[in-house]
């Protein structure tokens, strides 16, 4: 009787062990966005610059914008730089050996203050070339600043930045690409790819304990410039951002600088797409009370974050401050509950 019980118990234990091993080896039903840890300053603060639509071999005032970025970056002692995409014009990189990487990036952003990590998303022009070239770790071995992924998180403790690959959301690139060719090799099947992005983003935002949440994408959710609002992002992405109390959405794509804040959404919509060629003279916005700032020239943006305050400044090609916006949040220590 005793030996039968021992054999039976052993059988149950072995069965449970096999089940545990199979479960541990099985793929997770919910994947997670890759996360890069970026330590804040000793006081918990961070500061960074935001530039978009820039890679033109230094032309169209790219070099002048880079010079002023270096000056402002030194004054602020920035921690890193954010790129909102369209890193290499006109058609991305042809290969890992494309000289455009050096001519549009390494040889342009040479100021000492800009020798910090650059966190980059892809834009639609980047998708016109070899996407894997921009994503390759070989580029980082050539220039250690370059950190480019499709979608990922930068965790700076006080703030988390969620980088989203927005180009595959836009129907027109698939339905009517005209004479353009896009590299969708890492995107198909599209429906599954987009759902994965949305699921992982929603999970990351929901689980984030950061004081400030910022989302970065190439395409604008709201814009008064040539491309206007991106309807696919308004319907698919915006509800997730609003439900998870995102503070800022930062983008490029439209070659301008703008700040939109609507009564329908608590999110600040910030466009920094003036890294080189700008689009002068185009403006289409019907609710002037929502447009806090619009500039149809070249420039960039800075962000400074502390435990209780966030400050955004837009600069032109000469480094002049054009627009500033500040907000604040209560510190945890400010909440007092009497016994």
Curated annotation (Swiss-Prot):
Glycosylated where?
61, 284
Q: Which residues bind Fe cation?
A: 53, 86, 89, 255
Q: In which tissues is it expressed?
A: Expressed in roots, stems, leaves, flowers and siliques.
The cofactors named for this UniProt entry are:
Fe cation; Zn(2+)
Which reaction is catalysed here? Answer: a phosphate monoester + H2O = an alcohol + phosphate
User: Residues that bind Zn(2+), according to the entry?
Assistant: 86, 124, 218, 253
Q: Might you give the EC number(s) for this enzyme? A: 3.1.3.2
The protein depicted here goes by the name Purple acid phosphatase 4
**Name of encoding gene:** PAP4
């Amino acid at each position: 009787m005793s030996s039968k019980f021992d054999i039976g118990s052993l059988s149950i234990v072995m069965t449970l062990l096999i089940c545990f091993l199979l479960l541990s080896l099985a793929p997770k039903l919910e994947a997670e966005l890759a996360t890069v840890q970026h330590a804040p300053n000793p006081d918990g603060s961070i500061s960074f610059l935001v530039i978009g639509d820039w890679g033109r071999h230094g032309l169209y005032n790219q070099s002048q914008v880079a010079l002023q970025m270096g000056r402002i970056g030194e004054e602020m002692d920035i921690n890193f730089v954010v790129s909102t995409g369209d890193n290499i014009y006109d058609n991305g990189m042809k290969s890992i050996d494309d000289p455009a990487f050096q001519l549009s990036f390494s040889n342009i952003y040479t100021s000492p203050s800009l020798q910090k990590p650059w966190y980059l998303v892809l834009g639609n022009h980047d998708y016109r070339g070899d996407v894997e070239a921009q994503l390759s770790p070989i580029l980082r071995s050539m220039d250690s600043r370059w950190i480019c992924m499709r979608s990922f998180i930068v965790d700076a403790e006080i703030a988390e930045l969620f980088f989203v690959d927005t180009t595959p959301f836009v129907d027109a690139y698939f339905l009517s690409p005209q004479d353009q060719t896009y590299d969708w090799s890492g995107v198909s099947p599209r429906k599954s790819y987009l759902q994965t992005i949305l699921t992982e983003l929603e999970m990351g935002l929901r689980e984030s304990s950061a004081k400030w949440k910022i989302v970065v994408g190439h395409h604008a959710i709201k814009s008064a410039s040539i491309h206007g609002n991106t309807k696919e992002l308004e319907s698919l992405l915006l509800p997730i951002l609003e439900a998870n109390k995102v503070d800022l959405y930062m983008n490029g794509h439209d070659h301008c600088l703008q700040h939109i804040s609507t009564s329908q959404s608590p999110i600040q919509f910030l466009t920094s797409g003036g890294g080189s060629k700008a689009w002068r003279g185009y403006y289409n916005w019907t609710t002037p009370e929502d447009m806090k700032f619009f500039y149809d020239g070249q420039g960039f943006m800075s962000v400074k974050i502390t435990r209780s305050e966030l400050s955004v400044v837009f600069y032109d090609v000469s480094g002049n401050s054009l627009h500033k916006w500040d907000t604040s949040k209560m510190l945890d220590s400010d909440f007092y509950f009497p016994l």
